[in-house]
């Protein structure tokens, strides 16, 4: 048996045990992991230091190095995630719905685990804890393959998870870690139909496309977050200033940050100068269509704003930076058409006080999360009250939006009967009398 087969077979070997595991054991294990992480901060930070130093030697970008770092604040965050997941209701075995048929059968849907989940992710070691905790609580086995730049940090965290499992009786084979860096291992696992139930990539668009290209197993994903905010002519502009500013400036490098600002032409000259001023003060570069760029050029107070003409490609771009593309439209219909063409079906918002337009936007914008008068930055499992998340899905099969506990289960039909047979087609009565 080779390295990959052993890892996958170990994960599959505990699926039945996981399904029948008591919620109390799952919660106890998660809390034990939290305790061990809290107690072993020095060990975690020492292993993490090796990764950070190696990353700097390799010349990785500062943003990548920053995502690698595990300081006390981020360790506190991992401890909180574990405690939060432990406090959430256990979805496994929940009967979602039950109904009675005329023949007396009771038909229902029960939540059951997906099975073996393969997580492929990049530089953030926090994902090791987020993914493991969600899979453990939802009775899934997980195979973790983090980026090679975080291998020591991830190993340390998995060691603590397995130590907790041994102490509480949770099957430790439910958490498998790929501690080799060859890409070929990832491609081989992605082809293991029947053994891997689903793959979930977390990272940049190039990683996700590579996973989809090589996979023969189902993949739950989103390629990128080109989020849009439309400011309607009936918007409360005070709300709009704060919403747009938050969605772009608070944390520009995440997938739920806004990338395109769409403005109704009727309010362009009233709304955009102030908005451009606030964004410019925050260091945001604006890529404007002709009309919005002219507004900036005509206003001497905006001479400091870094604004340039937008290209067609800009509206498709996930900048993940302090850059915002701007487009002027006639009405809500044109705004929706723009979002349909350039957006990525992640998160989009309308700012308006008009109920009819708001409902039209909610119905017609085909995205995983659609907002009225709120920032797109809320698209997140914790912010939605779901607890930690495995990532955001923009797929239309199985799950859409934040992938939290319930999204790591699937419904199966359960049928309760009292001897019913279809069309009364049972053993003939005379045969019953003969023997």
Swiss-Prot record:
Gene: proA
Any one of the GO BP annotations: L-proline biosynthetic process
Subcellular localization, as worded in the UniProt entry: Cytoplasm
Record keyword Cytoplasm present: yes
EC number in record: 1.2.1.41
Disulfide bonds: none
Family per similarity comment: Belongs to the gamma-glutamyl phosphate reductase family.
Root EC class: oxidoreductase
Catalytic activity: L-glutamate 5-semialdehyde + phosphate + NADP(+) = L-glutamyl 5-phosphate + NADPH + H(+)
Task performed by this protein: Catalyzes the NADPH-dependent reduction of L-glutamate 5-phosphate into L-glutamate 5-semialdehyde and phosphate. The product spontaneously undergoes cyclization to form 1-pyrroline-5-carboxylate.
GO annotations of cellular component type: cytoplasm
Protein name: Gamma-glutamyl phosphate reductase
Xref: NCBIfam families: PRK00197.1 (NF001221), proA (TIGR00407)
GO molecular function: glutamate-5-semialdehyde dehydrogenase activity; NADP binding
Pathway of action: Amino-acid biosynthesis; L-proline biosynthesis; L-glutamate 5-semialdehyde from L-glutamate: step 2/2
Keywords tagged on the record: Amino-acid biosynthesis, Cytoplasm, NADP, Oxidoreductase, Proline biosynthesis
């Amino acid at each position: 048996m080779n390295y990959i087969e052993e890892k996958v077979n170990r994960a599959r070997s505990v699926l039945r045990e996981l399904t029948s595991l008591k919620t109390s054991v799952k919660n106890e294990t998660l809390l034990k992991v939290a305790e061990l992480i809290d107690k072993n901060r020095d060990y975690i930070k020492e292993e993490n230091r090796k990764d950070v130093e190696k990353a700097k030697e390799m010349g990785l970008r500062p943003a990548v190095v920053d995502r690698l770092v595990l300081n006390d604040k981020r360790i506190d965050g991992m401890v909180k995630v574990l405690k939060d997941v432990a406090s959430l209701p256990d979805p496994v075995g929940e009967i979602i719905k039950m109904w009675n048929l005329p023949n007396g059968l009771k038909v229902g849907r029960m939540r059951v685990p997906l099975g073996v989940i393969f997580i492929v992710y990049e530089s953030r070691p926090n994902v090791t804890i987020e993914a493991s905790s969600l899979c453990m609580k939802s009775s899934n086995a997980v195979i973790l393959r983090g980026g090679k730049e975080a291998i020591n940090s991830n190993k340390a965290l998995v060691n603590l998870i397995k130590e907790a499992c041994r102490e509480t009786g949770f099957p430790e084979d439910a958490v498998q870690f790929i501690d080799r860096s060859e890409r070929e291992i990832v491609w081989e696992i992605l082809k293991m139909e029947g053994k891997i139930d689903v793959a979930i990539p977390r990272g940049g668009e190039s990683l996700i496309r590579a996973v989809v290209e090589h996979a023969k197993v189902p993949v739950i994903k989103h390629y990128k977050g080109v989020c849009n905010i439309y400011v309607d002519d009936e918007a409360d502009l005070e709300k709009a200033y704060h919403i747009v500013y938050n969605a772009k400036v608070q944390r520009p490098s995440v997938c739920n940050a806004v990338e395109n600002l769409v403005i109704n032409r009727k309010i362009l000259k009233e709304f955009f100068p102030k908005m451009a001023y606030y964004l410019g003060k925050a260091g945001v570069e604006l890529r404007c269509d002709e009309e919005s760029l002219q507004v900036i050029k005509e206003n001497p107070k905006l001479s400091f704003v870094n604004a340039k003409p937008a290209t067609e490609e800009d509206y498709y771009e996930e900048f993940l930076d302090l850059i915002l593309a701007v487009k002027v439209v006639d009405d809500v219909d044109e705004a929706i058409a723009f979002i349909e063409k350039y957006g990525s079906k992640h998160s989009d918002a309308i700012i308006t006080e008009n109920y009819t337009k708001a409902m039209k936007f909610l119905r017609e914008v085909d995205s995983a999360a659609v907002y009225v008068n709120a920032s797109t930055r809320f698209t997140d499992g914790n912010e939605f009250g779901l607890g930690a998340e495995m990532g955001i899905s923009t797929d239309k099969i199985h799950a859409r939006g934040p992938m939290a506990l319930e999204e790591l289960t699937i419904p199966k039909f359960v049928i309760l009967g009292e001897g019913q047979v279809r069309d009364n087609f049972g053993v003939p009565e005379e045969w019953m009398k003969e023997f």
